């Protein structure tokens, strides 16, 4: 038996060979990445470095980071493999599977091949390692694996290439840089070789809406009845606090104050106070004349009859004559403006601030009521990342 045959027959030799191939592939990837960085075009001096820093800052704001892959022509399949499996060692397999899918679905992809290149030549070239792959390969990969691919670009909205219309679809996030290179996108603290599980806020909104509808169906909640009860309760509280019995007036004030009960009560009290002041102003001149006339007559009669009547009666009428100016002064003060313009503006500012706080509180309650199911495991929550909601869809 030769040495080669003996080596093949030894137990565990296949595992060592696979490990050696894996290490060789990793070394080749590192060398290719270093070479790509050295040979990367640098228009305008440090333009590429600035682009990388800007891209990193953009992703960091979303809680994400770049995981670079070698720019050896296999970068797209390396980045997709890192997202799908946690590493990029199977990029050749992903490339071949993508090409095979394009051949099977030729009628979908042939119209998008350049006119002067036959489809057979295009897929034959794409199947070779190191051939740059474009959007048609991303669409084929997404459809073949029944998932969505989200592409990040610097200072641009996200592109979502949908491989399926099913809900709760897995997403692979990659970055397109320098106009020719793809990298993998990971959570900012993810340094593992586990598959990436990123989910955009766009998809979370659809899931939350579906979950909320399902909850409402199961609980039998009638939204209209609930809103009607809330309005009636608010009207009752405002009416009890202000003494107002005009239902329409209360509802108008509630609507004007965005159903802020405290603000509506304040507004109604101000309206009632203004109405009362107007009534006092309309009736007060006549009342003052009436008060002044009898007071003077009583004072005069008190002086005229002081000799004929007892001293006590004179004192009583004199005291009444003295009391009427005090009452007149009190009534006059009650009609003076209670607050200055500055105080009124400050009061309006505080009321506006209260209304804004109430609106924020209502929004917070809505968000809390529409939160995700508490039954979702903590591991699943750790794999969620909230991203921007701006999307453009690329469909072939």
From Swiss-Prot:
It is an enzyme of class 3 (hydrolase). Residues 16-41, 280-301, 312-331, 343-379 have a biased composition (Basic and acidic residues). The gene is Otud3. One of its GO terms (biological process) is protein K27-linked deubiquitination. Residues 176-181 are annotated as: His-loop. Pfam families: OTU. The active site is at residues 72, 75, 181. Its EC number is 3.4.19.12. This is OTU domain-containing protein 3. The keyword Nucleus applies.
């Amino acid at each position: 038996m030769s040495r080669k045959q003996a080596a093949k027959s030894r137990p565990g030799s296949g595992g060592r060979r696979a490990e050696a191939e894996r290490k060789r592939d990793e070394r080749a990837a590192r060398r290719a990445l270093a070479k790509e960085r050295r040979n990367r075009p640098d228009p305008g001096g440090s333009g590429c470095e600035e682009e990388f820093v800007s891209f990193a800052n953009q992703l960091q704001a979303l809680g994400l980071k770049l995981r670079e892959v070698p720019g050896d022509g296999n970068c797209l399949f390396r980045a997709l493999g890192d997202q799908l499996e946690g590493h990029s060692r199977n990029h050749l397999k992903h490339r071949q599977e993508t090409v095979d899918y394009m051949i099977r679905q030729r009628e979908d992809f042939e119209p998008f091949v350049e006119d002067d290149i036959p489809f057979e030549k295009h897929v034959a070239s794409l199947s070779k390692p190191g051939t740059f792959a474009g959007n048609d390969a991303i669409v084929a990969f997404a459809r073949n694996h029944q998932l969505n691919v989200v592409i990040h670009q610097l200072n641009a909205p996200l592109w979502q290439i949908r491989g399926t219309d099913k809900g709760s679809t897995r997403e692979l996030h990659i970055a397109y840089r320098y106009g020719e290179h793809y990298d993998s996108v990971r959570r900012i603290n993810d340094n593992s070789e586990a598959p990436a599980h990123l989910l955009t806020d766009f998809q979370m909104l659809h899931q939350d809406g579906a979950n909320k509808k399902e909850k409402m169906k199961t609980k039998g909640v009638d939204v209209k009845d609930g809103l009607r009860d809330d309005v009636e309760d608010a009207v009752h509280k405002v009416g009890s606090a202000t003494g107002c019995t005009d239902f329409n007036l209360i509802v108008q004030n509630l609507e004007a104050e965005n159903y802020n009960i405290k603000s509506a009560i304040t507004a109604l009290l101000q309206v009632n106070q203004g109405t009362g002041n107007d009534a006092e102003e309309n009736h007060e001149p006549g009342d003052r004349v009436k008060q002044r006339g009898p007071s003077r007559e009583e004072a005069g009669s008190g002086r005229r009859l002081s000799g004929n009547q007892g001293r006590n009666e004179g004192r009583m009428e004199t005291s009444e004559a003295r009391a009427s100016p005090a009452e007149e002064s009190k009534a006059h003060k009650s009609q003076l403006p209670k607050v200055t313009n500055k105080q009124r503006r400050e009061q309006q500012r505080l009321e506006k601030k209260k209304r804004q706080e109430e609106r924020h509180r209502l929004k917070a309650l809505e968000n809390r009521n529409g939160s995700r199911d508490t039954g979702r495991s903590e591991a699943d929550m750790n794999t969620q990342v909230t991203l921007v909601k701006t999307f453009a869809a690329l469909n072939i």
